[in-house]
């Protein structure tokens, strides 16, 4: 069915607006040298390898380390053509902003088409401002950014009961990350429940078998240790049950917030079952940062719960009270989103102090400028995102790093980096080193 021009243009406008917000937040953090983790640098090194028609070598994980031995995310190669033309950390950050913005446009498209202009826009705004998306943008690039548009597209096809396209949009998830097979299998189970027995069974089989092959064959093949190093995160040194029962209040809050942003209406759609294995996997992992709502771990849940919301509002419900409540679902979701903005990552864009000059950023740029392009440098999380594009970068926490040309540390951001760069370099790498710069907590030493 053809859409009215306004119903076609509005989703695109919403996608562009939110994409601009995500890009602005990413770039502001980048130019202010606000480190979140080393992940953006890791993915840039991997994408750089693909961009030059080679393997995704990530020296930050170890000299010559193939990223496919860490996480199976070959889909990031799709960023490589853009990176080849615009080689920079900002290109990687913009890729994530664009991918999430596409998911916003997809959510808007199906919501407006199924629920009308006003309710559709309200749901889209709530989705675009959701905590899972904002936390992911704040955490810099991660491969799961590719899952956002794919899950939105598969979900939109589910709302339309377009079963073939549900399957087609689901399959690429296998190339996003090694554990996405469980989500593929969950979508297959939902299709099975919807009466699509053959398609459902195929997706379940592909998800389970494909995930097993990746975890036990592909990743061990590329990993120097011959295994999947994250296997020990489930239970860790404790039993899985002990971990599952740890901090129940925190985990319950994560669940409540995840479905609460839809006014709990998402629970009225079978599509919400996709969230169960994702949350379960996080809650039995012995890493406390998996249990909350920070970082990028809730990004994949956002298109799931909002598609479930749209599907729930689009369904015919037997109970009058549920029909009445579903009619107000968009308003409830928007109200929840408004309350959540008070301390949200995007809120910093409205604060004048965000744009004040950062003296340490000036010193950081000076330190980086003293490292010639193409030189090798051992560094910490505070500066690696800004160094990777033009230098061969190693992380100080990786064993067996070769002797670099420079060591550069950020000792002023509480990362625990060595205060005396010369003493560190001589102790770890030997030889003679000269202090080049010590300013505002940045220390740079050069090999002689």
Which residues does each predicted region cover?
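Membrane-lumen/periplasm interface segments of specific transmembrane helices
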Residues: 21, 25, 32-35, 49, ...
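Extracytosolic helix-loop segments that constitute the early lumenal/periplasmic catalytic or substrate-binding loops
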Residues: 42-66, 74-75
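Hydrophobic/aromatic-rich transmembrane helices and adjacent perimembrane loops
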Residues: 273-320
């Amino acid at each position: 069915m053809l859409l009215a021009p306004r119903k076609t243009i509005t989703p695109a406008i919403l996608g562009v607006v939110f994409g601009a917000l995500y890009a602005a937040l990413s770039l502001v953090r980048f130019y202010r040298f606000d480190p979140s983790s080393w992940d953006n640098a890791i993915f840039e090194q991997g994408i750089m390898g693909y961009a030059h028609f080679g393997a995704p070598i990530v020296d930050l994980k170890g000299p010559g380390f193939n990223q496919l031995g860490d996480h199976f995310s070959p889909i990031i190669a799709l960023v490589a053509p853009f990176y080849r033309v615009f080689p920079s950390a900002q290109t990687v950050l913009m890729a994530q902003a664009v991918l999430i913005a596409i998911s916003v446009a997809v959510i808007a498209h199906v919501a407006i088409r199924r629920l009308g202009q006003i309710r559709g826009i309200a749901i889209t705004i709530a989705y675009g401002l959701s905590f899972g998306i904002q936390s992911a943008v704040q955490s810099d690039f991660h491969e799961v950014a590719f899952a956002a548009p794919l899950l939105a597209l598969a979900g939109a096809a589910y709302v339309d009961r377009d079963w073939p396209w549900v399957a087609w949009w689901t399959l690429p998830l296998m190339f996003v990350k090694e554990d996405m097979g469980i989500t593929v299998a969950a979508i297959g189970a939902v299709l099975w429940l919807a009466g699509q027995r053959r398609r459902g069974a195929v997706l379940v089989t592909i998800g389970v078998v494909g995930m097993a092959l990746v975890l036990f064959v592909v990743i061990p093949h590329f990993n120097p240790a011959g295994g999947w190093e994250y296997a020990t995160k489930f239970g860790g040194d404790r039993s899985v049950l002990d971990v599952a029962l740890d901090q129940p209040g925190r985990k319950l809050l994560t669940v409540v917030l995840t479905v609460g942003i839809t006014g709990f209406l998402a629970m009225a759609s079978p599509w919400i079952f996709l969230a169960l294995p994702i949350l379960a996997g996080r809650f039995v992992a012995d890493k406390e940062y998996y249990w909350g709502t920070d970082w990028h771990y809730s990004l994949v849940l956002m298109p799931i719960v909002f598609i479930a919301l749209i599907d729930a509002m689009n369904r015919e419900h037997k109970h009058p009270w549920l029909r009445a409540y579903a009619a107000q679902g968009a308003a409830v979701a928007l109200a929840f989103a408004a309350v959540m903005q008070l301390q949200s990552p995007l809120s910093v864009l409205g604060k004048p102090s965000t744009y004040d000059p950062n003296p340490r950023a000036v010193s950081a740029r000076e330190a980086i400028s003293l490292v010639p392009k193409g030189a090798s440098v051992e560094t910490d999380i505070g500066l690696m995102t800004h160094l990777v594009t033009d230098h061969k970068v190693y992380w100080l926490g990786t064993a067996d790093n070769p002797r670099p040309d420079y060591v550069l540390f950020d000792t002023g951001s509480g990362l625990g980096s060595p205060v005396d760069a010369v003493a560190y370099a001589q102790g770890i790498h030997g030889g003679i080193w000269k202090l080049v710069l010590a300013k505002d907590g940045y220390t740079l030493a050069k090999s002689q």
